[in-house]
């Protein structure tokens, strides 16, 4: 199976422009040419190599060139447990075996800590299924993963004090997996989290802000939108959330950074970035 660069970007979280820059400078990843239309396509092995490079950069602090050099020179490895679990997941989803999918999710949770389970296992599966599954299988798989993320989220004890975050997907966004992962991270950092979930209209956001008075509102945009639609949805949300600071994230927001900043919101790709933005806002408010 081969995949286009846009698909690789969605699966790995690495932007298309970044992948093309790596290819020009380092010869990595290495594309093939599809028959008939001469498009650049990539093998599943290259996708896994890109993921390993990203992990080396993020987790071990290697530079891009160091990480790519290390991955290129890696000897063939035995298939790690996480990869075996992923293969079992896709196989059982393909067979529409919901009970077996549940067993795979149980097995993964047993051998992984919370961060590895949510960020390294469940969330990548959610991102990938949209480009490799038909509607029935995607519905089965995504429902089971969201259910599992919700269980992890609910199992975390609420903080008795600490900053408060209001989390929502805006109107029209029905995929809350990334939002749940953010909520898990914030709860583990001692935040009080109010989770509104998917497809939250502006009026509901406004009512929640009035009652909760959050320190920050986090909006997760997942689906692709035209620039005009994105700006309109965000403007409505910002009016509803005023005067509270709004941080935007999600795959559907990455292509609209100019609109996000020009409308007065902030952008974050992780809980760490969100917390850093909140600290900046708080420090600015406390200045004489």
From Swiss-Prot:
HTH merR-type domain location: 2-73
Query: Which InterPro entries does the record associate with it?
Result: Cobalamin-bd (IPR006158), Cobalamin-bd_sf (IPR036724), DNA-bd_dom_put_sf (IPR009061), MerR-type_HTH_dom (IPR000551), MerR_fam (IPR047057), Meth_synthase_dom (IPR036594)
Record keyword DNA-binding present? yes
Q: Which of UniProt's keywords are assigned here?
A: Carotenoid biosynthesis, DNA-binding, Repressor, Transcription, Transcription regulation
Q: Which residues form the signal peptide?
A: none
Q: Which SUPFAM superfamilies match?
A: Cobalamin (vitamin B12)-binding domain, Putative DNA-binding domain
Task: Tell me where in this chain the B12-binding domain is found.
Answer: 162-288
GO BP annotations, alphabetical order: carotenoid biosynthetic process
Please state how the activity of this protein is regulated. Answer: Binds cobalamin (vitamin B12), but cobalamin is not required for CarA activity. Interaction with CarS prevents binding to DNA.
Summarize the record's disruption phenotype note. Answer: Deletion causes light-independent expression from the carB promoter.
What is the superkingdom listed in this entry's lineage? Answer: Bacteria
Q: Which residues bind DNA?
A: 5-24
Gene Ontology MF: a single term? cobalamin binding
Disulfide bond sites: none
Similarity comment: family membership: Belongs to the CarA/CarH B12-binding photoregulator family.
Q: What does this protein do?
A: Negative regulator of the carB operon in the dark. Binds specifically to the CarA operator, in the region around the carB promoter, which blocks access to the RNA polymerase.
For domains, the record's comment is: The N-terminal region interacts with DNA and CarS, and the C-terminal region is involved in oligomerization and binding of cobalamin.
User: What is the protein's quaternary organization?
Assistant: Forms homodimers or oligomers. Interacts with CarS.
Q: Would you tell me the protein name for this molecule?
A: HTH-type transcriptional repressor CarA
Organism, per UniProt?
A: Myxococcus xanthus
Q: Which gene encodes it?
A: carA
